[in-house]
């Protein structure tokens, strides 16, 4: 595998601060179009793209994404994000994130604590955290202030098929995050698409994470362009 690219920590933090549109996608094994898809989404204005294969169609058809296959997919992400000056994130797996030279490691509430993950990944790697209630948001803000995480996500805003068993706290949690976090880096997530985006922005979010709004689009680039246009008009 090629030596992973490394970005200076200050560069990563600056790019995170400017990021508005964050895409989560699986490895698209059942389609075989990962490189084409990721490049199209990034060309449309996606700022951060994350590999998250858990619960995907590919996992149902072929089984869990093995470490070697995950690293092969990461090479595609690394190449595409380098070409488009975007950030590459890995979900959950600190070992994969480090081996792949990812820019970002994203953690759920049940994953490694951020302080432990920080001991595994390189010092300049950004770390994000999912939050699902007001208490978790407040804890994430404190962790951000302490330098344990670099951003957090809030949601889901609406129920999603990627996490069918998780209740959706809705836009009330987005409003709480806007109150608690202010202009710190945080993203609303969960069921957001072009039609729902104005409601999310009205609730106080300025950054979003999407999945199906782009992964299920007939034209991923156009879908990303539509979302980023609305986001930048509000910023």
UniProtKB/Swiss-Prot annotation:
Cofactor(s) demanded: Mg(2+)
GO biological process: thiamine biosynthetic process; thiamine diphosphate biosynthetic process
Gene3D superfamilies the record matches: Aldolase class I
Record carries keyword Transferase: yes
Top-level taxon of origin: Bacteria
Keyword Metal-binding assigned: yes
Transmembrane stretches, start-end: none
Binding site for 2-[(2R,5Z)-2-carboxy-4-methylthiazol-5(2H)-ylidene]ethyl phosphate: 160-162, 191
GO terms of molecular function: magnesium ion binding; thiamine-phosphate diphosphorylase activity
Record: residues binding Mg(2+): 92, 111
Enzyme Commission designation: 2.5.1.3
Pathway participation: Cofactor biosynthesis; thiamine diphosphate biosynthesis; thiamine phosphate from 4-amino-2-methyl-5-diphosphomethylpyrimidine and 4-methyl-5-(2-phosphoethyl)-thiazole: step 1/1
Catalytic activity: 2-[(2R,5Z)-2-carboxy-4-methylthiazol-5(2H)-ylidene]ethyl phosphate + 4-amino-2-methyl-5-(diphosphooxymethyl)pyrimidine + 2 H(+) = thiamine phosphate + CO2 + diphosphate; 2-(2-carboxy-4-methylthiazol-5-yl)ethyl phosphate + 4-amino-2-methyl-5-(diphosphooxymethyl)pyrimidine + 2 H(+) = thiamine phosphate + CO2 + diphosphate; 4-methyl-5-(2-phosphooxyethyl)-thiazole + 4-amino-2-methyl-5-(diphosphooxymethyl)pyrimidine + H(+) = thiamine phosphate + diphosphate
Binding site for 4-amino-2-methyl-5-(diphosphooxymethyl)pyrimidine: 50-54, 91, 130, 163
GO cellular component: cytoplasm
Keywords, alphabetical: Magnesium, Metal-binding, Thiamine biosynthesis, Transferase
Major enzyme class: transferase
Stored InterPro entries: Aldolase_TIM (IPR013785), ThiamineP_synth_sf (IPR036206), ThiamineP_synth_TenI (IPR022998), TMP_synthase (IPR034291)
UniProt remark on cofactor binding: Binds 1 Mg(2+) ion per subunit.
Family membership: Belongs to the thiamine-phosphate synthase family.
Function per UniProt: Condenses 4-methyl-5-(beta-hydroxyethyl)thiazole monophosphate (THZ-P) and 2-methyl-4-amino-5-hydroxymethyl pyrimidine pyrophosphate (HMP-PP) to form thiamine monophosphate (TMP).
Protein name: Thiamine-phosphate synthase
Lineage: Bacteria, Bacillati, Actinomycetota, Actinomycetes, Mycobacteriales
